[in-house]
Amino acid sequence: DLLDVRSAIQQGKRERSLRLGLGYERFTDGQLSDSWATGIFPNIQIGCHPEAIFLMRFLPHDTDPQKFWYDTMTLMFPVDDPNYCPPAWMGLPENTDVTGRNRAPTESYLKDEDPGLGLVLGQDAAFLPSVQEGMSSKAFQGQLWGEQEQRLRHFHVELEKRLGIQQS
């Protein structure tokens, strides 16, 4: 049963937090088990989890409108405990320093290379080329915006009007 699974995840994370001093008492049950994601600006997504925050940024290619750059960053609170290991689905390399003393190097990968992003971001990255291809489909008639995105879009339209920026 799905509720039993969610409850077990929540309970397990709370027990682990107490054992390792992670401070998860600040989180609701839903924040412990569910993926809380939000978009800011049209090209940035933030996935919030107790273990870390994923930042994903999509930038247009400088010369080819059929291409884009996909940047990801994983931010986490330092944990000074040798027994702590981030969940494997987060895609952090084994033996990642979670103490905050050493910053992991920036890595770059091309489209056909496996960046080892982990289960969640790996699935997202694998899906992106087909999304980009769909943008050129004859059936594509424009984006469907959720309420948050509509508000952001409206804000930027109004801001550009007030700044006197010509809209295309």
Question: PLM features: residue spans?
Answer:
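C-terminal catalytic domain of Rieske-type non-heme iron oxygenases
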Residues: D1-S168
